[in-house]
């Protein structure tokens, strides 16, 4: 991922240095496991643990000759050791090291992403509670429907991200898995105890069955889950963008002193952060195809997935980490214009209370079709003449003979739409 959309904490996980360090840790743990089984002298393992070092530049230099990165790596590490170097990579095949180490690196990335998710969820919870009773216009098909609250909108986002966190924790169990089962997965030259020891010490699980590789359905599920998280954020970001439109202006991204919105128009204050999240989500989601196409490898192994994953996995995790942090700050610092929310409710002449009038007539004994046919023409007239809906209702004796003035007051009271907000918050775990 380009530096512009990267944070150092996550980017450092995907460096060659960290990748080689992960390979080395797998190699050393394998030696320790062999030693536990009595194959490698403990003194040799001690020397390997103390003296084996990674030199990325030297490994790449060797790779120019070997044309094989793992062979180059093991030879470079061996240069830092004495006679004990013969035990490095003992009984292993390249992907025993590469796939297991990759899962370990992904685990490191996941620990950051999980913290990101938890922080975002906390910010959403705080926003939901702050604006629990702040009435605003609910819109369906982009058109005014009935009042909701900004807190309910935030509660919706909160529960969606809670589901995303749950899914993320589940996919961690699938992706944080190692394998050290040899060239075709049969443990022909390495006992399962080695795999168990290494994976336990790395804090990852073991694959019940593998070939030379871990199966890439795991990685596809992982990328799809991260893409779903990104897409939820995009949905929220698009909502902010729509609510920041000049003619709506119910919320606005924080605008810093000295910030510029346009090179040509000094007045501009644009939702560029939310637009950024929208674009990054598209990039992340685009990798779903790559991840799925990596699943059908040939027989017990090919490396068609390798080049794709070297690009895909860093890009997706780095981009999602960046997006989660940026969007958390956007939501946390979001300006909410409560007066504009109320003014927008009043823009449609009270039409948003049409269902309340309809239900009141039904409750008084009128059949639904008759009630609907009485209310709808008044609503259409209100739209077309810009006349307050209640005024037109009160001019129709067939309605006022059924509904008293007090009953109409109740129909047109926006606070009615707050009646179940506490229930919604309790169900969301926000009470």
From Swiss-Prot:
Record Pfam families: ADSL_C, Lyase_1
Tell me its EC number(s), please: 4.3.2.2
Q: In which pathway does it act?
A: Purine metabolism; AMP biosynthesis via de novo pathway; AMP from IMP: step 2/2; Purine metabolism; IMP biosynthesis via de novo pathway; 5-amino-1-(5-phospho-D-ribosyl)imidazole-4-carboxamide from 5-amino-1-(5-phospho-D-ribosyl)imidazole-4-carboxylate: step 2/2
Q: Got a GO cellular component term for this one?
A: cytosol
The positions flagged as active site in the entry are: 141, 262
Q: Which domain of life is it from?
A: Bacteria
User: What SUPFAM superfamilies does the annotation carry?
Assistant: L-aspartase-like
Q: Does the keyword Protease apply?
A: no
The similarity annotation says: Belongs to the lyase 1 family. Adenylosuccinate lyase subfamily.
Report the function annotation for this chain: Catalyzes two reactions in de novo purine nucleotide biosynthesis. Catalyzes the breakdown of 5-aminoimidazole- (N-succinylocarboxamide) ribotide (SAICAR or 2-[5-amino-1-(5-phospho-beta-D-ribosyl)imidazole-4-carboxamido]succinate) to 5-aminoimidazole-4-carboxamide ribotide (AICAR or 5-amino-1-(5-phospho-beta-D-ribosyl)imidazole-4-carboxamide) and fumarate, and of adenylosuccinate (ADS or N(6)-(1,2-dicarboxyethyl)-AMP) to adenosine monophosphate (AMP) and fumarate.
**Quaternary data:** Homodimer and homotetramer. Residues from neighboring subunits contribute catalytic and substrate-binding residues to each active site.
This protein is called what? Answer: Adenylosuccinate lyase
């Amino acid at each position: 991922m380009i530096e512009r959309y990267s944070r150092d904490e996550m980017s450092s996980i995907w460096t060659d240095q960290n990748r080689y360090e992960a390979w080395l840790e797998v190699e050393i743990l394998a030696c320790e496991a062999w030693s536990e089984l009595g194959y490698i002298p403990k003194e040799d393992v001690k020397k390997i643990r103390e003296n084996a070092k990674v030199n990325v530049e030297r490994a790449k230099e060797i790779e120019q000759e070997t044309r094989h990165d793992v062979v180059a790596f093991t030879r470079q590490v061996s240069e830092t050791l004495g006679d004990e170097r013969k035990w490095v990579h003992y009984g292993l095949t390249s992907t025993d090291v590469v796939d297991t180490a990759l899962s370990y690196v992904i685990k490191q990335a996941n620990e950051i992403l999980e913290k990101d998710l938890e922080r975002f969820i906390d910010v959403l919870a705080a926003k939901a509670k702050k604006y629990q009773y702040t009435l605003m216009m609910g819109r369906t098909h982009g058109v005014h429907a009935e009042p909701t609250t900004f807190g309910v909108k935030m509660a919706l986002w909160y529960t969606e991200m809670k589901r995303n966190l749950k899914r993320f924790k589940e996919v961690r169990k699938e992706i944080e898995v190692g394998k050290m089962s040899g060239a075709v997965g049969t443990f022909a030259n390495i006992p399962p105890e080695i795999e168990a020891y290494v994976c336990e010490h790395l804090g990852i699980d073991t694959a019940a069955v593998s070939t030379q590789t871990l199966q890439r359905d795991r990685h596809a599920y992982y990328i799809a889950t991260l893409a779903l998280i990104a897409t939820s954020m995009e949905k929220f970001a698009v909502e902010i963008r729509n609510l920041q439109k000049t003619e709506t202006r119910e919320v606005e991204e924080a605008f810093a002193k000295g910030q510029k919105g346009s090179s040509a128009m000094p007045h501009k204050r644009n939702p560029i952060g939310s637009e950024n999240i929208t674009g990054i989500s598209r990039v992340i989601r685009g990798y779903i195809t790559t991840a799925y196409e990596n699943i059908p490898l040939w027989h017990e192994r090919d490396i068609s997935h390798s080049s794709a994953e070297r690009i895909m996995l860093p890009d997706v995790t780095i981009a999602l980490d960046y997006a989660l942090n940026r969007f958390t700050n956007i939501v946390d610092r979001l300006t909410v214009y409560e007066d504009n929310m109320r003014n927008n409710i009043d823009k449609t002449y009270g039409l948003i209370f049409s269902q309340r009038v309809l239900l009141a007539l039904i409750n008084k004994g009128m059949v639904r079709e008759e009630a609907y046919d009485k209310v709808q023409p008044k609503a259409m007239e209100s739209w077309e003449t810009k006349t307050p809906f209640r005024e037109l209702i009160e001019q129709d004796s067939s309605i006022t003979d059924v509904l008293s003035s007090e009953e109409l007051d109740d129909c047109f009271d926006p606070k009615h739409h707050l009646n179940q907000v506490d229930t919604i918050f309790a169900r969301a775990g926000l009470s």
